[in-house]
C-alpha cells in the first residue's frame, strides 16, 4: 500500500479534495489493485481508535452503576461532531437567504422601480457569492461527519470483537452467530453515512423557523397554508412508509423461504444432480418466487407513489401559499418567484431532511444500546493455577452449563402439564426435562500423576468434552476443586484451521524449534501430505482449511496441540476423521512415544486406546461410571462396553429406538421452541435448549452436518431481508417509518464466507448458538463427495495455489521469535493473492451491451420507454404553448400597463398569472401534469417482470451447469446472486431507473423552455452538460472499482470473526487473543483504507459538480441581468429555472451513477445465465404455478425422466474402462486409467487412505466430474443415453446428507411419483415409520433448517428410503456410518441386506466390520487401482486392508479362515453380532 498524499496535502488541497486526483486518474486508465490503495491516516487506525474508546468505556464501567456507551462515545467524538454541525448549519443558512436576493433582483426590473436597476449587478454578485460560500462549507462538513461516523464504527467494532474473545462459554451458548454477525453487519457504514444527517434534527427546525419568518414578511398568514400542506404530506409519506414496511415484512418471509431452499440447493448441488432433482427444485423455488413477486409489486407501487408525491408536491405548496394572499390582496410577480424559491428549500427540510434525521437517531441509538448490552455480558474467568503442581487433581467436582436451572425445570413441568400429554409420553417428557436441570458433571474425582495417560470414554453426551472444558476454565465448577499447573495444550474434537500456512497453524505463535517441529510433523503423519505441495508447509490454507480433507485437518490440529510445550495435553477425540490405519500409527508414534513423559487426557472410545492408558475414566450421563486401570475395568464392570458405546442391547431394539426418537423429538420441540408446531405455550416460554451441555451437544453431534446452517425458515414469522437478526425475545424491530424510501436492503450483504452466512443473514434464524458452532464439525469435514465448492472437494495435494481466500491478506507469517510481533506492513503479494477468488471479471463500468440486453429481454419494456417519451413530448409541447401565450400577453401588457386592477378576481388572470401558471408547470421542474403522475407505473411494473425473467433464467442455468463450472465458484458467490443481486433487481433498480428517466426528462424540458426565452443561455448549457458527462465518466471508473474493493474488504472482517469463534477454545487455551485482535485490526484497517478513499473521491466528484454549477449560475446571472430589458417575468423565470436546472441535473448525474452501479448486478446475473449447460435435455413443458401456490401445500410435479416401461438397468452389471477424472477442465487428474468390472448383485468395498479418491470415484460414476473413458451398465454405454437417465440407474447415500425445507413426503419423493401407501411401506422397511409418526402431520410435517429435528442417523435413513423408492439397481454408499449411532447403523446394514439383496452395491467405508460383507475390494492408491481382489486374497497378501486390521481383530473376525467358505461366512456373521459392541467406534 502506498503512503497517502493526504499527509502532505496543503490546506487548499484538503479543502477541494485535490489530493485524490492521482488515484482517480489511475482508476480511469487501468484496473485498480489493492496495492494502489493508500494507507489510512494514523487517526483512523483501528488500534488508536479502539484504545481511545476502550479507555473511556472502562472509565464509564468503573465510575457508574448504570454505564452508558453513548457517554464514552461523547467524550471521544463530541466536540468535533459539533464543530462540523455548525459549519453544516452555516452552509444550509445560505440556501435560505438566496431567495431574498433573487426577489430583489426581480424587483429591480419592475418599470416602477428604476432606482434599484443600478444595484442589480451587485445583487447578482451577492447571489453568486452565497453559492460559492455554500460549496466551500457544505462538502468539508459532510466529509468530516462521514469520517467521524467511520471512526465511531471502527472503535465499536474493535470493542465488540475484543469482548467476544472474553465471553464466558455460558454466554456464548445463548448468543447465535447470526446475532453477532448482525451486530456488526447492520452497523457497517450505518454510522458513517448516518452522522451527516444527524444534525438536521436541530438544523431543519431552525431552517423552517427562518423560512417561515421570511415567508410571513412576503405573504403574511397565508404562508402557513403551504407549511400545513407539507406537514400533511410528510405524515402521508410516513403512512405510505408503514404500508410499505408491512408489505416488505410479508415478503421477507417469502424471500427467506426461497433463499432457504436456494441455499440448500446450492450447498447440495451435487446431491441434487445425483438424485436428478433439478426440475423438482426449480419448480419448488419458482412457485415461492411467484408469491414473493406479488408482494414485491405492491411494495414497489407504494414506493413509486411516495416518490411521485415528493415530485408533484411543489406545485401545491406554492399554490396553497400564494392563493389565499392573492385572493385577499393583489400580488406582484416578484413575490411569486421568491415564494417558489423559498418553498423548494422548505419542502426539502420538512419532507426529507427532518424525517431522515429522526430516523437516523432512532436507528443509531438503538444500535448503540444493543452494543452496550453486549459489552456488559459475563466474561470467562481463567482458573487460578498452581505452577508448582505436577499432577492433575479433581475432587468432587459438579458443574452446570446453565445457571438458574431449577427455575427452568419448574417452567418446563408447568408447560408439559398444560399440554395434557398421555401418561406413557409423560414419563419420557419428564425424563427429558430432568436432564435440563441436571448437572453436566456430577461428583467427579480423579488424580493423575505427571506423565500418565488418562483415557476418558462414554457415550455421546456423557460429559467428556465438558470435563476438558472444566480443566481449561471454560466451565466453572459449582462445587469441588480442580488443581493443575496451568500450562495446557488443547486439541478440539472438530479440527479448527486458521487462515494462514500449515506451518503457522502448527506453530501457532509459539517460538520455532526446527527439531521439535519436524518430529511433530512426522509423528502426526503429515510428511507425505506436505511433500505434495510446491510450497511445502508454506502453502496458504483458505478459510477453515477448505482445501484439505477432514483427516488432514484433524492431523494439523493435533500437530498444533503437540507442538506446544505444555504440562498437560487435552485431546478431545482427535482421531474422528482418520482411517483405521492412520489412526493406529498416530496413536502409537504421537500419543504413546513422542508425548510419553507428558500428562495426557485423551477422549476416546477405542478399546485399543483404553488398553494402553494408565488410567481410565468412564462417564455415564455426567457421573463417574468407572475410574481405574483397564484390568480393574474388566473385573469390576463387565457391562462397560454398552455404557461406553451408548446402548445397552439390541434385544430391546425397537423399544429403545422408539424411546430415543420420542425423547429426541420432544426435547427439540420443547427446548428450541422454533419448530413449526402448534405448541404455542412452548414458544412463549422460548426455551432455547439451555440444558446440560451433553444434551445440547447430542443435538449437534448426532447432527453435525446441519449444525452450521445459513438460513432457516420459521413458519408464520415475518422476516426482514435487511440482515437484522434481533434477540429472540424482542419483537420484530419496527422502524419508525418516517422515511418514505428508507435504505433498501440490497446493500446490507454479509460476508461471502463459504462456511457460514453466505448472503444476507435473515432475521429469526434458527438459533444456532456460538457454542454450537464451536462444537460442530463443518459440513464438509472429511469428504469430497457432495463437497460445497471446488476447494472443499479438491484434496490438499491437488489444490491449485490460486484459490486463496480474503483472509489470506492479513494472516501474515508469524515472526520466528514471537507471534505477537507482526509487521505493520501488509505484503503486497498477499494482498493480490487474497482477492483472486473474488475479483469479478466484469468491467469497471457497465457496458452498453448489458443495457441493450436488459432492455430487450422483455418485449414490452421498449414500448414502455417509448410511452414515457411520448408523454414527455406532450408535456414539453404544452410548456411551449404556455410560453407563446406568455409572450403574447406580455406584449399586450406593454400596451395597457396603465390599466388599474382593483378586482381581486381579475388579478388572478393578469399577465402575472400567466407567468405563474407557466412557471408552476416547468419552474419547479417537477410539477408535471396528472398524466405524469402515473406515467412511471408501467415502467416499474415491467422492470419487475424483467427481474422475474432473469431470476428464472439464472436458476435454470445454475441447475443445468456442469459441476466443473460450479466447482470453480464459491457457494457464497452463487447465493449472493440469488439474494443480493435479485433484491437489487426487484427493489432498487426499477425505482432508480424511474427516478433517472424522470429527472433527465425534467432537465431537458427545463433547458428547452429557458432556451426559448433566452437563446444565449442555450450556449452556456451545452458545455456544462458536456462537462458533467465527462466528469461522470472520469469518476465512475474509479468509484465502481473502489466500491468493489470495499465490499471485498468487508469479507475478512466477518470471516475472521467466525474463524475466531470456531476456534475460541483453542485460542484461549494457547493464549493467542492479542494476536487475533491484531489480525482483526488489520482486517478493519484494510476495509477502512478502501472506504475512506471511496468517501474522499465521492466528495471530490460532488464538489467538482457543484463548482461547475456555480460557474454556470454566475454566467447565467450576468447574461440575464445584462441582456434582459424591461419586464419582470423573464429574469425571474430564467434565474429560478437556472437554480433548479442545476440542482436537478446534479441529482440526475448521481442517479445515473446509481443506475450504473446497480446494473453491475444485472451484468453478474447475465454472467450466470451464460454458464454452459451439462447437456441438452428432452423438451419439457414450461411451468406456471397457480396463483395461490403456497409452500405448505404439496406441490406435485411431473417427472419427465421416468418411463412407464423402463426396464434398464435390469441386472446392475458394471464395466469401467480407462476412467480418468478431473475436478475442473485442464486440472490434474484425480483418478487415472481406472478399469474393473462388477458382476450383477456383487458388493464391492473401496479401500484407501483419507483423500485417496474413493469419494471421487463415486462422483465419477455419476458423471459429476470431467471424465474420460467409458462405463457400461448392463451393456449400455454412458455416451448413448441422457445424463438424467444415466443417473437414474444409481441409488446414492452421500456422505453429506441432504434434507431440504419441505414435508417428509416431498423430501422422499419430490416428483410426487409414489402414493402414501408405497412411501409408508418403504419407511417401514428402513425403520423410519416410528420417526415420522412422532410428528404432527406425519408425512406432511414440514422439516426446516436441514431437518434439524432429526438426528444424523435419521437423515441417513431418509437417504436410504430415497434409494429404495428410486428402485435403482446400483447403490453407491459414501461412508454412510461416519456419524451414526449404533442402532441406526444396524438398521442400515439390515436394509442393505434385505431391500438391496439383488442390487450391485459399491461401498466406501472406514469401519472394518461394514467392509466384511463385501465380496471384492478395490484398493486405490496414488490415483490408481492398486488391487482388485477378494477378502481372502487381500488378507493373505501384505495389503492396505491387512495392515488396517490389528492381529486381535483378525483373530476375532477370522478364527477359522481355513474352513469352508459358507461356514466361514456364517461364523463371521455370528461373531460380528457378539463382538459388535467392542469394535463399535462411535463417531463424535
UniProtKB/Swiss-Prot annotation:
GO CC terms, sorted: apical plasma membrane; cell surface; chloride channel complex; cytosol; early endosome; early endosome membrane; endoplasmic reticulum membrane; membrane
Keywords associated with the record: ATP-binding, Cell membrane, Chloride, Chloride channel, Endoplasmic reticulum, Endosome, Glycoprotein, Ion channel, Ion transport, Isomerase, Isopeptide bond, Lipoprotein, Membrane, Nucleotide-binding, Nucleus, Palmitate, Phosphoprotein, Repeat, Transmembrane, Transmembrane helix, Transport, Ubl conjugation
Binding site for ATP 1: 401, 434, 458-465, 493
Enzyme class: isomerase
Membrane topology: Multi-pass membrane protein
One Pfam family of this chain: ABC_tran
Comp. bias regions, Basic residues: 1456-1465
EC number: 5.6.1.6
Binding site for ATP 2: 1223, 1248-1255
Residue numbers covered by motif PDZ-binding: 1482-1484
Positions of post-translational Phosphoserine modification: 549, 660, 670, 686, 700, 712, 737, 769, 792, 797, 815, 1448, 1460
Protein name per its UniProtKB record: Cystic fibrosis transmembrane conductance regulator
Source organism: Mustela putorius furo (European domestic ferret)
Lineage of producing organism: Eukaryota, Metazoa, Chordata, Craniata, Vertebrata
Amino acid at each position: 500500500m502506498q503512503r497517502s498524499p493526504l499527509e502532505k496535502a496543503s490546506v487548499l488541497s484538503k479543502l477541494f479534495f485535490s489530493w485524490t486526483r492521482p488515484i482517480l486518474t489511475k482508476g480511469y486508465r487501468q484496473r485498480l489493485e489493492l496495492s494502489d490503495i493508500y494507507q489510512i491516516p494514523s487517526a483512523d487506525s483501528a488500534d488508536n481508535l479502539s484504545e481511545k474508546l476502550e479507555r473511556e468505556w472502562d472509565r464509564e464501567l468503573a465510575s457508574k452503576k448504570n454505564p452508558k456507551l453513548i457517554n464514552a462515545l461523547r467524550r471521544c467524538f463530541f466536540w468535533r461532531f459539533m464543530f462540523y454541525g455548525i459549519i453544516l448549519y452555516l452552509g444550509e443558512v445560505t440556501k435560505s437567504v438566496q431567495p431574498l436576493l433573487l426577489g430583489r433582483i426581480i424587483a429591480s426590473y419592475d418599470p416602477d422601480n428604476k432606482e434599484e436597476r443600478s444595484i442589480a449587478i451587485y445583487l447578482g454578485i451577492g447571489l453568486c457569492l452565497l453559492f460559492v460560500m455554500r460549496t466551500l462549507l457544505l462538502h468539508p462538513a459532510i466529509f468530516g461527519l462521514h469520517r467521524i461516523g467511520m471512526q465511531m464504527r471502527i472503535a465499536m467494532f474493535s470493542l465488540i470483537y475484543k469482548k467476544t474473545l472474553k465471553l464466558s462459554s455460558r454466554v456464548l451458548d445463548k448468543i447465535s452467530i447470526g446475532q453477532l454477525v448482525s451486530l456488526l453487519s447492520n452497523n457497517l457504514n450505518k454510522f458513517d453515512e448516518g452522522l451527516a444527517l444527524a444534525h438536521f434534527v436541530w438544523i431543519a427546525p431552525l431552517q423552517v423557523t427562518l423560512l417561515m419568518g421570511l415567508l410571513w414578511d412576503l405573504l403574511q398568514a397565508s404562508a402557513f397554508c403551504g407549511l400545513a400542506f407539507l406537514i400533511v404530506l410528510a405524515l402521508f409519506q410516513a403512512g405510505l412508509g408503514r404500508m410499505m414496511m408491512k408489505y416488505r415484512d410479508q415478503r421477507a418471509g417469502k424471500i427467506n423461504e426461497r433463499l432457504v431452499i436456494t441455499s440448500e440447493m446450492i450447498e447440495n448441488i451435487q446431491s441434487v444432480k445425483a438424485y436428478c432433482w433439478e426440475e423438482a427444485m426449480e419448480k419448488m423455488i419458482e412457485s415461492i418466487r411467484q408469491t414473493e413477486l406479488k408482494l414485491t409489486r405492491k411494495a414497489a407501487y407504494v414506493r413509486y407513489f411516495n416518490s411521485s408525491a415528493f415530485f408533484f408536491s411543489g406545485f401545491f405548496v406554492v399554490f396553497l401559499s400564494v392563493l389565499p394572499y392573492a385572493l385577499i390582496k393583489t400580488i406582484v410577480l416578484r413575490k411569486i418567484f421568491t415564494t417558489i424559491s423559498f418553498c423548494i428549500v422548505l419542502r426539502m427540510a420538512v419532507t426529507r431532511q427532518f424525517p431522515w434525521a429522526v430516523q437516523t437517531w432512532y436507528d443509531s441509538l438503538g444500535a448503540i444500546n444493543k452494543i452496550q448490552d453486549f459489552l456488559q455480558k459475563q466474561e470467562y474467568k481463567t482458573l487460578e493455577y498452581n505452577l508448582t503442581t505436577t499432577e492433575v487433581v479433581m475432587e468432587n467436582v459438579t458443574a452446570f452449563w446453565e445457571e438458574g436451572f431449577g427455575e427452568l425445570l419448574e417452567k418446563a413441568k408447568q408447560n408439559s402439564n398444560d399440554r395434557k400429554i398421555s401418561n406413557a409420553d409423560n414419563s419420557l417428557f419428564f425424563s427429558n426435562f430432568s436432564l435440563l436441570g441436571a448437572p453436566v458433571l456430577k461428583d467427579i474425582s480423579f488424580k493423575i500423576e505427571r506423565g500418565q495417560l488418562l483415557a476418558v470414554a462414554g457415550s455421546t453426551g456423557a460429559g467428556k468434552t465438558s470435563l476438558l472444558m472444566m480443566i481449561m476454565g471454560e466451565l466453572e465448577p459449582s462445587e469441588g476443586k480442580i488443581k493443575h499447573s496451568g500450562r495446557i495444550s488443547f486439541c478440539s474434537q472438530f479440527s479448527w484451521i486458521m487462515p494462514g500456512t500449515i506451518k503457522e497453524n502448527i506453530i501457532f505463535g509459539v517460538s520455532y524449534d526446527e527439531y521439535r517441529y519436524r518430529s511433530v510433523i512426522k509423528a502426526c503423519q503429515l510428511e507425505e501430505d506436505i511433500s505434495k505441495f510446491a510450497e511445502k508447509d508454506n502453502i496458504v490454507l483458505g478459510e477453515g482449511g477448505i482445501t484439505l480433507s477432514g483427516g488432514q485437518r484433524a492431523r494439523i490440529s493435533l500437530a498444533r496441540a503437540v507442538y506446544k510445550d505444555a504440562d498437560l495435553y487435552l485431546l478431545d477425540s482427535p482421531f474422528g476423521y482418520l482411517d483405521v490405519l492412520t489412526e493406529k500409527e498416530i496413536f502409537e508414534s504421537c500419543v504413546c512415544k513422542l508425548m510419553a513423559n507428558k500428562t495426557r487426557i485423551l477422549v476416546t472410545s477405542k478399546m485399543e486406546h483404553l488398553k494402553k492408558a494408565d488410567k481410565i475414566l468412564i462417564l455415564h450421563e455426567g457421573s463417574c461410571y468407572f475410574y481405574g486401570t483397564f484390568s480393574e475395568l474388566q473385573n469390576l464392570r463387565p457391562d462397560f462396553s454398552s455404557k461406553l458405546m451408548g446402548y445397552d442391547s439390541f434385544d430391546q431394539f425397537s423399544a429403545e429406538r422408539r424411546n430415543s426418537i420420542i425423547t429426541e423429538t420432544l426435547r427439540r420441540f420443547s427446548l428450541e421452541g422454533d419448530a413449526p408446531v402448534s405448541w404455542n405455550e412452548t414458544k412463549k416460554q422460548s426455551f432455547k435448549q439451555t440444558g446440560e451441555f451433553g444434551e445440547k451437544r447430542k443435538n449437534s453431534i448426532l447432527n453435525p452436518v446441519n449444525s452450521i446452517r445459513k438460513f432457516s425458515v420459521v413458519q408464520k414469522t415475518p422476516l426482514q431481508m435487511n440482515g437484522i437478526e434481533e434477540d429472540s425475545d424482542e419483537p420484530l424491530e419496527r422502524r419508525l417509518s418516517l422515511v418514505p424510501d428508507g435504505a433498501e436492503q440490497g446493500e446490507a450483504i454479509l460476508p461471502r464466507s463459504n462456511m457460514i452466512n453466505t448472503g444476507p443473514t435473515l432475521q429469526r434464524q434458527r438459533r444456532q448458538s456460538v457454542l454450537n458452532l464451536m462444537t460442530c464439525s463443518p459440513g464438509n469435514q472429511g469428504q469430497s463427495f457432495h463437497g460445497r465448492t471446488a476447494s472443499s472437494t479438491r484434496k490438499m495435494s491437488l489444490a491449485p495455489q490460486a484459490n486463496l481466500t480474503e483472509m489470506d491478506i492479513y494472516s501474515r507469517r508469524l515472526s520466528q521469535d514471537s507471534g505477537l510481533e507482526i509487521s505493520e506492513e501488509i505484503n503486497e503479494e498477499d494482498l493480490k493473492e487474497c482477492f483472486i477468488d473474488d475479483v469479478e471479471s466484469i468491467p469497471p463500468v457497465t457496458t452498453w451491451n448489458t443495457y441493450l440486453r436488459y432492455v430487450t429481454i422483455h418485449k414490452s419494456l421498449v414500448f414502455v420507454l417509448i410511452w414515457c417519451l411520448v408523454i414527455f413530448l406532450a408535456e414539453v409541447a404544452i410548456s411551449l404553448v404556455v410560453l407563446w401565450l406568455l409572450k403574447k400577453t406580455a406584449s399586450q401588457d406593454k400596451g395597457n400597463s396603465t390599466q388599474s386592477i382593483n378586482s381581486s378576481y381579475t388579478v388572478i388572470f393578469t399577465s402575472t398569472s400567466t407567468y405563474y401558471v407557466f412557471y408552476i408547470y416547468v419552474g419547479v421542474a417537477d410539477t408535471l401534469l396528472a398524466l405524469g403522475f402515473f406515467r412511471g407505473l408501467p415502467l416499474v411494473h415491467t422492470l419487475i417482470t424483467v427481474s422475474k425473467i432473469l431470476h428464472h433464467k439464472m436458476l435454470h442455468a445454475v441447475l443445468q451447469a456442469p459441476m466443473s463450472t460450479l466447482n470453480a465458484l464459491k457457494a457464497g458467490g452463487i447465493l449472493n446472486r440469488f439474494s443480493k443481486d435479485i433484491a437489487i433487481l426487484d427493489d432498487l433498480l426499477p425505482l432508480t431507473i424511474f427516478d433517472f428517466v424522470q429527472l433527465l426528462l425534467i432537465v431537458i424540458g427545463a433547458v428547452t423552455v429557458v432556451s426559448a426565452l433566452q437563446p444565449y443561455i442555450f450556449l452556456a448549457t451545452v458545455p456544462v452538460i458536456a462537462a458533467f458527462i465527462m466528469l461522470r465518466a472520469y469518476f465512475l471508473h474509479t468509484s465502481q472499482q473502489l466500491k468493489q474493493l470495499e465490499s471485498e474488504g468487508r469479507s475478512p472482517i466477518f470471516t475472521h470473526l467466525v474463524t475466531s469463534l470456531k476456534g475460541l477454545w483453542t485460542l484461549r487455551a494457547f493464549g493467542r487473543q492479542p494476536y487475533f485482535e491484531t489480525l482483526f485490526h488489520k482486517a478493519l484497517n484494510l476495509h477502512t483504507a478502501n472506504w475512506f478513499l471511496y468517501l474522499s473521491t465521492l466528495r471530490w466528484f460532488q464538489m467538482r459538480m457543484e463548482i461547475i454549477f456555480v460557474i454556470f449560475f454566475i454566467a447565467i446571472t450576468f447574461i440575464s441581468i445584462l441582456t434582459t430589458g424591461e419586464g419582470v417575468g423573464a429574469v425571474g423565470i430564467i434565474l429560478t429555472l437556472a437554480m433548479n436546472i442545476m440542482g436537478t441535473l446534479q441529482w440526475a448525474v448521481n442517479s445515473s451513477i446509481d443506475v450504473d452501479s446497480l446494473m453491475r448486478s444485472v451484468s453478474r446475473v447475465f454472467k450466470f445465465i451464460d454458464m454452459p449447460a451439462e447437456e441438452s435435455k428432452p423438451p419439457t413443458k414450461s411451468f406456471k404455478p397457480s396463483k395461490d401456490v403456497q409452500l405448505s401445500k404439496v406441490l406435485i410435479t411431473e417427472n419427465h425422466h421416468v418411463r412407464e416401461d423402463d426396464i434398464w438397468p435390469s441386472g446392475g452389471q458394471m464395466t469401467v474402462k480407462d476412467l480418468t477424472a478431473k475436478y475442473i477442465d485442464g486440472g490434474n487428474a484425480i483418478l487415472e486409467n481406472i478399469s474393473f468390472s462388477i458382476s450383477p448383485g456383487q458388493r464391492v468395498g473401496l479401500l484407501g487412505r483419507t483423500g485417496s479418491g474413493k469419494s471421487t470415484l463415486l462422483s465419477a460414476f455419476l458423471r459429476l466430474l470431467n471424465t474420460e473413458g467409458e462405463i457400461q451398465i448392463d451393456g449400455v454405454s454412458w455416451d448413448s443415453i441422457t445424463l438424467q437417465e444415466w443417473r437414474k440407474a444409481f441409488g446414492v447415500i452421500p456422505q453429506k446428507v441432504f434434507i431440504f425445507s419441505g414435508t417428509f413426503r416431498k423430501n422422499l419423493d419430490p416428483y410426487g411419483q409414489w402414493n402414501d401407501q408405497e412411501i409408508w411401506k418403504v419407511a417401514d422397511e428402513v425403520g423410519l415409520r416410528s420417526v415420522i409418526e412422532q410428528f404432527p402431520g406425519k408425512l406432511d410435517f414440514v422439516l426446516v433448517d436441514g431437518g434439524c429435528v432429526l438426528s444424523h442417523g435419521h437423515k441417513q435413513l431418509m437417504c436410504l428410503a430415497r434409494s429404495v423408492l428410486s428402485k435403482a439397481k446400483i447403490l453407491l454408499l459414501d461412508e454412510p456410518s461416519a456419524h451414526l449411532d449404533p442402532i441406526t447403523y444396524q438398521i442400515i446394514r439390515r436394509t442393505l441386506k434385505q431391500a438391496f439383496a439383488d442390487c450391485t452395491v459399491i461401498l466406501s467405508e472406514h469401519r472394518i466390520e461394514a467392509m466384511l460383507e463385501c465380496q471384492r475390494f478395490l484398493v486405490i492408491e496414488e490415483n490408481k487401482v492398486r488391487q482388485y481382489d477378494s477378502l481372502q486374497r487381500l488378507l493373505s497378501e501384505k495389503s492396505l486392508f491387512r495392515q488396517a486390521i490389528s492381529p486381535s481383530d483378525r483373530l476375532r473376525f477370522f478364527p477359522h479362515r481355513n474352513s469352508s467358505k459358507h461356514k466361514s461366512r456364517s461364523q463371521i456373521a455370528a461373531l460380528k453380532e457378539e463382538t459388535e459392541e467392542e469394535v463399535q467406534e462411535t463417531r463424535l
